[in-house]
Amino acid sequence: MLYLLLTTTLLMMTWNRYAGRIAFLSLLGYFVIMLNIWLHFGSLSESVTLLFGGGLVRLDESILSALLFILFLGLVIMNRTGDLGWEFHLLLMGGLTGAIYMLTAYDLLLMVVGFEFLNLSTYLILSLYRGTETATLKYLLSSAFYTTLLLLAISFFYGLTGSTGYDALFVQMNYLGGETFLPQILLLGTIAFKLGLVPAHLWVPDVYDGLPMTLLSWMGSVPKAAVLLWLPTIYPLLNQLAPFLLVLSALSFLLSAVLMAAQYKMKRFLAYSAIGHLGFVVAAFAIGDYHAYGYYIFIYMIATLAQFVLLSELPQTELMKQTSVLKDHRALGLGFLVIVLTMASLPPFAGFYAKLLVLFGFLEIGYGIFAVLLILASLRSAAYYLKWIQTTFFSVVPFASAPIQVQYPNLVSFLVTLILPSTLLLLL
C-alpha cells in the first residue's frame, strides 16, 4: 500500500487536474487485488494464516474481509469527493494505509504506527476546509491525550511481559492476572475515545458540528470502522474488562436516547445517534457475540456513509430545516426515508435485524436487564427518527427548492443494501 501511495502521489502532483480520477482508479486497482487474494483464501479447504516480517504482520480470511470493507468505504468517499484537490486524496489514501497497517499488525508497535498514520491523516483532512479550525483543534488535543494513554498501556504491557508481539502477550495474560488491570484500563480509555463511548464522548458533538458533511463522511466511517474491526484481534488483552465495556456501551446508548431529544442542529443529532449505535455495536462485542458484532458493523457503516453522502447534497445552512426540500426530489426523498428507517431499526429494514441479534445475544446469556435497556433505548431513539421524517415530509418548505445533483449509482447501491434485508439474512 505504501508503494501505491507513493506512486499515486507522484501521478497526482504531475496531473493534479485529474487527481480524483487517479486516486480512485489506484484505490480500485488495490481493491481488486485484495479481492482476488480473498477469493483465493476462500477457495482453500482449511483456514490459513500467513505471517510476515517475523510475525509482525498477520493475514487471514477475516482480516482480508476487514481490509476489503475498509477499502470499500474509502472508494465510496473518494468517488463522492472527486472534485477536491490532490491533497485531500493523498491524505485519504494515507488514512486508509494507516487503517490497513493497524488491522494487519500482529505487534503493538506496528499497530501504533498504523494508528498514528490514520490519526495524522484525519487531523490534516479535518483542517482542509476554512471554518473547521475549532473542531480540528478539539479533536487534535483530545486525541493527543488518549494516544498518550495508549502508549502508556503499551509500555506497561511490555514491562510486564517483555514483548510487544500479540502471541507472547496473549500467552502471558493467562499468568499475570490482575497485574495487567491498569494497562487494560488505559487501552480501554483510548478505545472509548476513538469510538465516542461514554464518558469519552464529549468531543463527538462538538467536532461533528464544526465539520462539513463531506468531511463527516470520512470522520464517521473509516476511523471508527478501523477500531471496531481491530477489536477482535486484541480481545485477549481486554478479557478482564468485558463487564466494564458492557457498562460503557449501555451508558452510551442510554445517553444517546436521552440527549437526542434536545438536539436542534442536524450534525449534533447525528453525533448522538452515532454514540448510541456504537454503544449497541460494542455491547455485542462485550458479550462475545461476534456474529451480531460483524453484522451490526456492516449495516451501521453502510447506513452512516449513505446518510452523509445524501445530506451532503443539501445546502449546508440550517440543515435541519433544509431536509424538507427532499419531498420535492423523489429519488433523494426515498433514499432519505430508507436510511432514516434503517437507523431507527424499524422492520423490515436491515437495522432492525442488526439490533435484534444483539437483543438475542443478551437473552441467550441471561442479561435480561441489558435486554430491557436496549429495548427502551431503541424505542425512544426511534421516536426521534420518526419525528425527523415527519419534519422532512410533512412540514412547510422554508426555502426555495434548490436543484440537487443526485448520484444515482451510489443511491441505488445503498438502497439495495438497506431495503432488502432478505439478502442480508444470507449472512446470518
UniProtKB/Swiss-Prot annotation:
So what does this thing catalyse?
a ubiquinone + NADH + 5 H(+)(in) = a ubiquinol + NAD(+) + 4 H(+)(out)
Q: List the disulfide bonds.
A: none
Instruction: Indicate how the chain sits in the lipid bilayer.
Output: Multi-pass membrane protein
> Do the record's keywords include Mitochondrion?
yes
> Which Gene Ontology terms of cellular component type are present?
mitochondrial inner membrane
Question: What sort of enzyme, by top EC class, is this?
Answer: translocase
Q: What is its EC number?
A: 7.1.1.2
| Keyword tags | Electron transport, Membrane, Mitochondrion, Mitochondrion inner membrane, NAD, Respiratory chain, Translocase, Transmembrane, Transmembrane helix, Transport, Ubiquinone
**A GO molecular-function descriptor:** NADH dehydrogenase (ubiquinone) activity
One Pfam family, short name please?
Proton_antipo_M
Which InterPro entries has this protein been placed in?
ND/Mrp_TM
User: Where are its TM segments located?
Assistant: 22-42, 59-79, 84-104, 108-128, 140-160, 185-205, 218-238, 241-261, 269-289, 292-312, 332-352, 356-376, 384-404, 408-428
Entry keyword Iron = no
Ranges in coiled-coil conformation: none
Compartments reported by the entry = Mitochondrion inner membrane
The similarity annotation says:
Belongs to the complex I subunit 2 family.
Give the function comment from the record. Core subunit of the mitochondrial membrane respiratory chain NADH dehydrogenase (Complex I) that is believed to belong to the minimal assembly required for catalysis. Complex I functions in the transfer of electrons from NADH to the respiratory chain. The immediate electron acceptor for the enzyme is believed to be ubiquinone.
Q: What is the recorded name of this protein?
A: NADH-ubiquinone oxidoreductase chain 2
Give the classification, highest ranks. Answer: Eukaryota, Fungi, Fungi incertae sedis, Chytridiomycota, Chytridiomycota incertae sedis
Gene symbol of the encoding locus: NAD2
